[in-house]
Structure formats: C-alpha cells, structure tokens
Design a protein with these regions (language model features):
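Hydrophobic-face residues of short alpha-helical interaction/recognition segments
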Residues: 34, 38, 42, 67, ...
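Generic detection of well-ordered alpha-helical segments
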Residues: 20-24, 28, 32, 36, ...
Length: 96
C-alpha cells in the first residue's frame, strides 16, 4: 500500500507541474480503488451499490476542481480519501 501511495503522490506532483499524462495515469489508477470504496460504503449503509459510479464521478470532479488545494509536501492518498469520504457521506445524507 505504501508503494501505491508513493506512486499516486508522485503522479499528482507531476500533474500539478503540468504533466497531463501523469494526471491521466493517476485518474486511471485511483478510479477502481474509489469505485470499490464507494460500493463498500453504500453496502455498509444498506444502500444500492448502483450509485457508486455517480459518487466516483463526483469524487474525480472534486479532485480536479480542488487539486490546487492539495499540499504537494503531503501524501496524496489521505487527501483523496478525505474527499471521497465526505462525498459519500453527502450522498448518503441526501438519500435519507
């Protein structure tokens, strides 16, 4: 897991510096992990997992729009998963 986090952090640093290929690789790498996390979160809450794709798209959009707020000296994964957690909770609140 540490290798994955280091890889994601490096890709995000490169993306922030303007490397669009690194940004594409990062999004491709995080998407299945986010999808699995969204499906798990929905299932634990007793919600249909078919909403996972919508949540993943919301997360990826938020990452794109907020990428300038990420501290490049910090690991990327905790920042990403904080966004994911917050958007999943928002989705669950809106469903109730």
């Amino acid at each position: 897991m540490r290798e994955r986090d280091d890889e994601w952090t490096g890709l995000m640093r490169s993306a922030i510096a303007g490397d669009s290929a690194a940004y594409h690789r990062l999004l491709k790498a995080v998407t299945p992990v986010l999808r699995a996390a969204a499906r798990r979160g929905l299932a634990r809450a007793g919600q249909p997992v078919d909403q996972a794709e919508d949540i993943v798209q919301d997360i990826l959009l938020a990452v794109h729009l907020k990428r300038h707020t990420w501290d490049v000296s910090a690991p990327f994964a905790p920042w990403l998963f904080a966004i994911a957690r917050n958007l999943l909770l928002k989705h669950l609140r809106n469903r109730c």
